[in-house]
Amino acid sequence: MTMCKNKLALAVVLGLGMNSPLWAAEGGIEARLAALEARVLAAEARATAAEARADEAQSKANEARETAVVAKAQSEKVDKQTAGAQGFEFHGYARSGLLVNGNGNGGRGGPYITPAGSVGGAVGRLGNEDDTYMEANLLKTQTFADGSWARYKLMLADGVETSNDWTASDSSLNTRQVFAEIGNLASFDGPFKNAVLWAGKRFDRDNFDIHWLDSDVVFLAGTGGGVYDVQLADSWKANFSLYGRDYGDISASGLSDIESYILTMNNRVGNWQWMVNGLSAKDNETRINDGGAGSEAANKGAHTLLAYHADSFFGINPGFSKAAVLYGHGLGAELKGLGSDSELLPDADAVRLAVFGATDLAPRWRIAPALLAEQSKDRYVKGDEYRWVTLNGRLAQVLSQNVELVYEATWQYMDLAPKGYKGRQAVSGDFTKLTFAPTFKAQTVGFFERPELRVFATWMDWSSELDHYASNDAMGQSNFTAGGEWNFGVQMETWF
């Protein structure tokens, strides 16, 4: 179109020029026409070449844009895959706070503060913690072309009671978990089609706890290997594992490196869980318990758990609830921390009951009750007996989107007859704790929404007889005796 316009303009100019006297005056019309035509053809050639170069440049520009669009799409796809299936994850838990008693000194606290705490009897944790504790979980997941995946996990943890900012000399920083697992393996079929294989040092995936008491119902952990999610029937999955734990040396007998091994089958059928464990610790029977003449430790044991995990609050309200009963014999009589107690006797027996849950009572009120109880005998010394029961209730009143008032009440009864084990005395009595904690949150949408920032006041009291259980526990120490104790403080707690 541009070239046509140029030709028309040139013809007009030529027509006007040929009618002028100057044109007529000069001779050789034909020669002049030939010269003019040559110049026109040359101009057309230059215009055609210029247009071709412009078209080529436009084509290259279009190709460059298309290449850029494709490259951007591919880059976004790779970035999405990297952030997902090939992603790196960071998860954690932490709590930290200040606990001050009514005299202005550092307060005494902790879920295992009572004499029953020496055998696992926890009490409510709200307004009762004086430590800084953190867990950092680093995970890397890879997904392959055939759909199989691999995951690596590292967990670091540390806990201190000092309020100082530099705590290296008091630190207990350690590696609590380091393991790898693989799943969705292409060559696996039948019951193992969706199985997950693992090996390393870890907490068992199916452990569960009562958060309000900071107490696991069952805690299986150590170093070993296993397989999860073997499909034995339509609604029946089973886990199989072997864990090892180190009992250390028995210097009196010259034995070293005594280890406990835990062989586990953990079954899930619908909402039901049935766990069976066998324990063995070769040569552990040469261990003689302090204060128990002739009380040789066990070298084997058994443990079982039956639990129901409900997706409602005991069938009467939305929420959740769990109930579990546990039994253990010999090395299995440590019902919570499987394989963690090397001093249990061959005849040790223990039974534990756990019932807990959480629900909304009304649009602005939430409640979380819990019951935990245990009885054991012939535990460390022939004829000893330990009985305790804890009732705990946490209540939350939502004031606004960011503020709630939290209340917690704990009552624990204990009857302990240690028969002189570690110099401990027989005692019985009860313990009571009441806590009021105004709490600030980014969103007050549930009990388990974190982080929480709390200020609190806690009152505790207990039977005076409990002051005499042991010389090295909290109760009975200076400024911490029966008759009522106040603690005040501030705390943060978070997980993600």
Regions found by a protein language model. Name each.
Residues M1-A9:
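Bacterial N-terminal signal peptides that target proteins for export
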